[in-house]
Design a protein with these regions (language model features):
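Extended, low-hydrophobicity, polar/charged segments
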Residues: 1-175
Length: 175
């Protein structure tokens, strides 16, 4: 597991380069909020991968963590995640747990899980775009990645986990 931002960034770039992924790096002013950084990058909110770490209780004894990845113009549907995970309770993970599991700080969480304790679930509506955009484990650098390469490398579980599109984000942005 990564222990700092540089590790997460390096791990991501190494993975992409080793597999010949098609991506572009985009430098910008430090910003982690999807609705603010998207215009800086020149992408539509629907192309932004908003990444949210959730805690799901399964019964009384089992706790699982989910990295929910949704379009930037949508809100995560907690009940849909709970149902998909066959959980009994779902909530947002605390920032310290989210950052430990994701290997980067809030606002820079990658739409990849390099941690076996963090299950990656992606809403398929994000994958309708030719490219997806996200902060590259840094507030001052983003990445545009071909969607086909993202699917091949991240190997996400797909599930409809959004409440709606085109609404103001109701959850903290962790893209």
């Amino acid at each position: 597991m990564q222990t700092n931002i540089e590790d997460a960034y390096t791990q991501l770039i190494t993975l992409l380069d080793q597999h010949g992924a098609h991506y572009r790096l985009i430098d910008h002013a430090p910003e982690g909020r999807t609705e603010i950084v998207s215009p800086m990058r020149g992408n539509a909110l629907s192309q932004a991968a908003k990444c949210i770490v959730l805690m799901v209780k399964i019964g009384k004894k089992i706790t699982r963590y989910v990295l929910a990845v949704i379009p930037g113009d949508a809100r995560v549907d907690l009940q849909a995640v709970k149902s998909l995970m066959r959980g009994t309770y779902v909530t947002f993970a605390s920032p310290d747990i989210a950052e430990r599991l994701a290997g980067s700080v809030t606002g820079t969480i990658l739409p990849f899980s390099f941690n076996p304790e963090l299950e990656l679930i992606v809403d398929p509506s994000l994958l309708e775009n030719e490219e997806i955009y996200f902060n590259a484990a840094r507030l001052d650098r983003s990445l545009a990645l071909k969607t086909g390469d993202y699917i091949a490398l991240a190997k996400p579980r797909l599930g409809r986990i959004t409440e709606g599109r085109g609404t103001s984000p109701g959850a903290p942005s962790h893209s």
